[in-house]
Amino acid sequence: MLKQRTIKSIVKTVGIGLHSGRKVELTLRPAAPGTGIVFSRVDLPTPVDIPASAMSIGDTRLASVLQKDGARVSTVEHLMSACAGLGIDNLYVDVTAEEIPIMDGSAASFVFLIQSAGIEEQNAPKRFIKVTKPVEIRDGDKFARLEPYFGFKLKFTIDFRHPAVDKTGQELEVDFANTSYVREIARARTFGFAHEVEMMRELGLARGGSMDNAIVLDEYRILNNDGLRYDDEFVKHKMLDAIGDLYVVGHPLLASYTAYKSGHGLNNALLRELLAHEDAYEIVTFDDPQAAPKGFAFDAQTAFA
């Protein structure tokens, strides 16, 4: 059977919160089959466990924020994206602040951390959410849609009227049957505009943001001396975010995702719309790994790698 996966050993790292600018300690621990991805605020007087779920996402203005009993964990999307890309089903994430550290602004550090811990298959069937009917959410001209597909593919279009972004391509389509998440998506960094960063800092946000963890643009160009990691890094990062946003549904999706100018809020609304229609999805497993869609029947060390 196609099995669930966790990590083999405990791994730790330290980084800074994008908005607080404060040091954050992050510990990843193995979890039993059926646990899911569980975030734990171990810095609180009584630690609070917050399982990743579509219904636990609260604030989505600047990141995807999990909330429970007054506790929050912000900016979970890059770590969730890495878990999706490596096929991790079960994991405890201990964090000492209300933000996951931003690291280099991509998912690459989390991919490295998980691969360093080692990936272990567990004796339980991997569960998928198979989309059986189209589901769509719109907000003005923005939209996000899930449609039936035997695999996982995404098409994302952005629309930033900026000369540097225009040059790199504003649309990307990826099918993980033939694309490596680790090589083609994981290293894409978050990006922002210099004038917006200044405004955010005045509001007490983005205190940890720098060219070490983001692509920064002025009105005309990219300010980072090292340039871009991918020719189309901007739209690839939006896809990286979407993969993480969608993975909070609790299981990998078997679906085709199409989006135009979508963000954390619209992605979460799409998951809630899906879950509200019980006839739009079903939970499936694969007794024969070879019967699973290409890209999911991976060996124990790589998923979309």
Swiss-Prot record:
Pathway(s) where this gene product acts: Glycolipid biosynthesis; lipid IV(A) biosynthesis; lipid IV(A) from (3R)-3-hydroxytetradecanoyl-[acyl-carrier-protein] and UDP-N-acetyl-alpha-D-glucosamine: step 2/6
Catalytic activity line of the entry: a UDP-3-O-[(3R)-3-hydroxyacyl]-N-acetyl-alpha-D-glucosamine + H2O = a UDP-3-O-[(3R)-3-hydroxyacyl]-alpha-D-glucosamine + acetate
Cofactor(s) required, per the database record: Zn(2+)
One GO term describing the cellular component: membrane
EC numbers, comma separated: 3.5.1.108
Alphabetized SUPFAM superfamilies for the sequence: Ribosomal protein S5 domain 2-like
Keyword presence, Metal-binding: yes
GO terms assigned for molecular function: metal ion binding; UDP-3-O-acyl-N-acetylglucosamine deacetylase activity
Binding site for Zn(2+): 78, 237, 241
Pfam family of the protein (one): LpxC
Record key words, sorted: Hydrolase, Lipid A biosynthesis, Lipid biosynthesis, Lipid metabolism, Metal-binding, Zinc
GO biological process, one term: lipid A biosynthetic process
Purpose: Catalyzes the hydrolysis of UDP-3-O-myristoyl-N-acetylglucosamine to form UDP-3-O-myristoylglucosamine and acetate, the committed step in lipid A biosynthesis.
Family indicated by similarity: Belongs to the LpxC family.
Name used for this protein in its record: UDP-3-O-acyl-N-acetylglucosamine deacetylase
Organism: Burkholderia ambifaria (strain ATCC BAA-244 / DSM 16087 / CCUG 44356 / LMG 19182 / AMMD)
The organism's taxonomic lineage, starting at the top: Bacteria, Pseudomonadati, Pseudomonadota, Betaproteobacteria, Burkholderiales
